[in-house]
Amino acid sequence: MKRSLLGLALVLGLLAAVPLVAHHSFSAEFDNQKPVVLKGWVTKIDWTNPHVWIYFNVKDPKNGQMTKWGFEMGPPHLLQGSGWTNKSLKVGDEIEVGGFLAKNGSNRMSVNNQVGVKFAATGQPVGRGGAALNNATQ
C-alpha cells in the first residue's frame, strides 16, 4: 500500500511540474538563430515574477518612426544577484539591448546573456550582466 501511494505521489509530482517546464521554454517563444541589438528609450518596467519585462521605444533610422518593443529577463531575485534592482532603469533612460527575436514576429525579445542591457550614452552594462539576465537556455 505504501509503495502504491509513493508511486502515485511521484506521478502526480511529475505531472504538476509539466506546466512549469512549458512555461520556461525559451525555444518555444524565441529564436536563438535571430539575434538582434536595438537601441531605444525605456517606457515601462514590469518588475514582477515570474519574469521581468522592460518595454522601450525604438526609433527607425530610415523614417524616424517609433516602434514599441519589449524584452524578457529572468525573475527579480536572480536579477538582484546580478546587481539589478527595480530602480536600475527608469522611464526615459536610453538603452541598448541585445537579444533574440520572438518566433511569432511580434516586437518582443529575450535578453542575450552575453550582450545584455547597456546604457546607450556610456556603453556601461546595467547591473553586472551574466546568466541571471535570463534564466532560459539559449
Regions found by a protein language model. Give the residues of each.
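Bacterial N-terminal signal peptides
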Residues: 7-19
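Short, structured beta-strand/loop micro-motifs enriched in basic residues and often containing a Trp
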Residues: 73-81
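Conserved hydrophobic positions within beta-strands
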Residues: 40-42
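Short boundary/loop segments of OB/S1/cold-shock single-stranded nucleic-acid-binding domains
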Residues: 21-36
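Positively charged n-region of N-terminal signal peptides that target proteins for export
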Residues: 1-7
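OB-fold/S1-family single-stranded nucleic acid-binding modules
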Residues: 102-132
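Short nucleic-acid-contacting surface segments enriched for D/E, G, S/T with interspersed K/R
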Residues: 81-97
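Short aromatic-glycine-enriched beta-strand elements
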Residues: 48-59
